[in-house]
UniProtKB/Swiss-Prot annotation:
It comes from Homo sapiens (Human). This is Cofilin-2. The phosphorylation of Ser-24 may prevent recognition of the nuclear localization signal. Controls reversibly actin polymerization and depolymerization in a pH-sensitive manner. Its F-actin depolymerization activity is regulated by association with CSPR3. It has the ability to bind G- and F-actin in a 1:1 ratio of cofilin to actin. It is the major component of intranuclear and cytoplasmic actin rods. Required for muscle maintenance. May play a role during the exchange of alpha-actin forms during the early postnatal remodeling of the sarcomere. The keyword Cytoplasm applies. The lineage of its organism: Eukaryota, Metazoa, Chordata, Craniata, Vertebrata.
Length: 166
């Protein structure tokens, strides 16, 4: 069921910037988004980039020690969100980077919010072409352990996520 919610152009720009890994200067790399949250606008008509809810590559090792743990802390405990997380992980064969689309719908979120976000998910997913990994998360217990994301990325072949062993 479509909700009539549209996707703001800034959301698409953020996605395209995260998806394309072109050779960049060190300064440009630091400004790349590692993780970003998207929410509904106040009038519930648009999916927008949530202000100040992002992690930049340049933050890692500076204000952010562990990007995965910091990302989990950005998620609101009592409301839904969409998120993009640029996962850096290692399998037994090689190092990889993949974007993960996350639909955060905690049990404690209001029913109306869960319904609007669930019915609007297709609108944002259609704009995020080429995403290999999608994950619906219904509470902190599902996401706080990085090994759960490791399983989503490659089953039991993933040996580390963000440089930390699973």
């Amino acid at each position: 069921m479509a909700s009539g919610v549209t996707v703001n152009d800034e959301v698409i720009k953020v996605f395209n910037d995260m998806k394309v890994r072109k050779s960049s200067t060190q300064e440009e790399i630091k400004k790349r988004k590692k993780a970003v949250l998207f929410c509904l606008s106040d009038d519930k008509r648009q999916i927008i980039v949530e202000e100040a809810k992002q992690i930049l590559v340049g933050d890692i090792g500076d204000t952010v020690e562990d990007p995965y743990t910091s990302f989990v802390k950005l998620l609101p405990l009592n409301d839904c969100r969409y998120a993009l997380y640029d996962a850096t992980y290692e399998t037994k064969e090689s190092k990889k980077e993949d974007l993960v689309f996350i639909f955060w719908a905690p049990e404690s979120a209001p029913l109306k919010s869960k319904m609007i976000y669930a019915s609007s998910k297709d609108a944002i997913k259609k704009k995020f072409t080429g995403i290999k990994h999608e994950w619906q998360v219904n509470g902190l217990d599902d996401i706080k352990d990085r090994s759960t994301l490791g399983e989503k990325l490659g089953g039991n072949v993933v040996v580390s996520l963000e440089g930390k062993p699973l």
